[in-house]
């Protein structure tokens, strides 16, 4: 197959037979259609386009658009960006103030930058522009109603139909769902959730004197509800102030944000934006594909369960989804497509899945003993060094716990249950799951 041998050769379709090529051109069958132009979707579109495939990126909003997000860019996020990407930092963090529900405040500092802070509209827009420069085509203001893998809209078993609001149908050899935590593509795949949290956030413009006090420093406050915490992220003349806690604690979460803002002395400043957002974390056995459809980022429930950090998970899973979508687009039958989808699941679970597994244990331990976490980060150099290494990208939470006996013992003492992989069970179980995902292709709506 010349297309497989030369991934830089852009073709109308992954199938190079003359008859199919002419038909594809007439019906405009895309190699890869990506739904959602956030960090996960833009990364997937970039990865597929840079491989020479014909890629369409769909986004329901007009860009740029606001997203509820702290906007912290840690090392793993930076390392997953396209070559030449210049981060639009609003601030660079060298100090962290920790507090335990407003008490026992202590600030720790680092000579090297810990992480950077961005505004999502700028960041997302730049990611999309990189995907476009790589060859992806963007359509905004379109809403996907459903995807179909058989039926009258689908010309053959190698094609997926993406049905838009209004009835237009787009055909593709592979589809990547990156349409966020309320994903319609996720519903089609059958994504199952294990943890749902509510994040509330306010963008608060402040005078220059207040902004100067926060420059280069963030605040992390361990909250009053189990597993909750708050943050202040400075971005020039605006402070991003937010809190997050388990869903079902809506009134208490709102009260926490109000108390938090009041304690900070910011109650007198009017927010320019107040917003809320649900973060959703996948169950261990949640599928990552169905037929020729993959999911990534929030649509797949991929985020770090303890901190609920999602940007690095979106960028990394999006890149993998784009790379494996290219292989699925090239697959000539269901068996090969199934094999490629299974490989994508293995790639996700071997990396991000391990981090999620450790993150779940960290969250359980944090829910029980937030004061101990606070004491460690503010009083023990190894704990602070671990925080620095993770945020700077020198290691990950999974690598840290698995590679350092002291960290293993500490986590085992806090959470004595045996470690479970985030869906990294026996290969036989995964193969069976992949077969079910592939063989039950069809239509789902939400």
For each feature predicted by the language model, list its residue ranges:
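Glycine-rich FAD pyrophosphate-binding loop
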Residues: 33, 37, 46-69
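C-terminal helical "tail/cap" subdomain of flavin- and related membrane-associated enzymes
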Residues: 326-430, 435-446
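Intrinsically disordered, low-complexity terminal tails and inter-domain linkers enriched
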Residues: 1-27, 150-157, 331-334, 420-444
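Conserved N-terminal glycine-rich FAD pyrophosphate-binding loop of Rossmann-like flavoproteins
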Residues: 61-84
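A conserved beta-strand/loop capping segment in the N-terminal third of enzymes
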Residues: 77-126
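Predominantly flavin-linked oxidoreductase catalytic cores and closely associated redox partners
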Residues: 51, 130-271, 301
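Beta1/beta-strand and adjacent pyrophosphate-binding region of the FAD-binding site
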Residues: 24-40
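FAD/FMN-dependent oxidoreductases across multiple families
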Residues: 146, 169, 248-324, 330, ...
């Amino acid at each position: 197959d010349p297309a497989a041998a030369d991934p830089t050769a852009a073709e109308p379709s992954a199938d190079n037979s003359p008859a199919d090529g002419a038909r594809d051109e007439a019906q405009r069958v895309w190699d890869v259609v990506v739904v959602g132009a956030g960090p996960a979707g833009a990364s997937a579109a970039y990865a597929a386009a840079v491989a020479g495939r014909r890629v369409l990126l769909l986004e329901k909003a007009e860009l740029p658009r606001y997203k509820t997000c702290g906007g912290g860019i840690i090392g793993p996020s930076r390392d997953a960006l396209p070559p030449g990407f210049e981060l639009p930092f609003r601030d660079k963090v060298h100090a962290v103030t920790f507090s335990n529900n407003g008490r026992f405040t202590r600030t720790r500092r680092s000579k090297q930058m810990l992480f950077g802070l961005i505004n999502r509209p700028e960041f997302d827009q730049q990611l999309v522009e990189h995907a476009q420069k790589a060859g992806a085509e963007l359509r905004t203001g379109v809403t996907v109603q459903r995807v179909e893998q058989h039926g009258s809209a689908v010309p053959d078993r190698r094609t997926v139909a993406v049905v838009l609001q209004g009835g237009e149908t787009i055909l593709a050899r592979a589809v990547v769902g990156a349409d966020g935590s309320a994903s319609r593509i996720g519903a089609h795949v059958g994504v199952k959730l294990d943890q749902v949290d509510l994040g509330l956030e306010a963008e608060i413009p402040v005078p220059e004197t207040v902004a100067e006090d926060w420059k280069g420093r963030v605040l992390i406050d361990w909250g009053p509800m189990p597993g909750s915490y708050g943050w202040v992220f400075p971005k020039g003349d605006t402070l991003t102030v937010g809190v997050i806690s388990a869903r079902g604690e809506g009134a208490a979460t709102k009260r926490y944000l109000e108390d938090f803002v009041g304690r900070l002395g910011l109650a007198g400043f009017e927010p320019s934006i107040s917003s809320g957002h649900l973060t959703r974390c996948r169950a261990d056995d949640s599928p990552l594909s169905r037929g020729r459809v993959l999911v990534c980022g929030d649509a797949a429930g991929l985020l770090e369960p303890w901190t609920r950090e999602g940007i690095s998970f979106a960028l990394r899973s999006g890149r993998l989804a784009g790379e494996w979508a290219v292989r699925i687009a090239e697959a000539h039958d269901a068996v090969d497509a199934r094999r490629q989808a299974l490989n994508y699941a293995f790639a996700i679970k071997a990396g991000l899945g391990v981090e999620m597994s450790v993150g779940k244990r960290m969250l359980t331990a944090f829910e029980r003993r937030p004061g101990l976490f606070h004491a460690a980060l503010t009083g023990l150099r190894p704990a602070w060094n671990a925080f620095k290494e993770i945020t700077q990208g020198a290691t990950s939470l999974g690598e840290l716990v698995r590679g350092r006996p002291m960290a293993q013992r500490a986590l085992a003492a806090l959470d004595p249950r045996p470690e479970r992989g985030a869906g990294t069970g026996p290969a036989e179980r995964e193969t069976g799951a992949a077969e079910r995902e592939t063989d039950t292709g069809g239509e789902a709506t939400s």
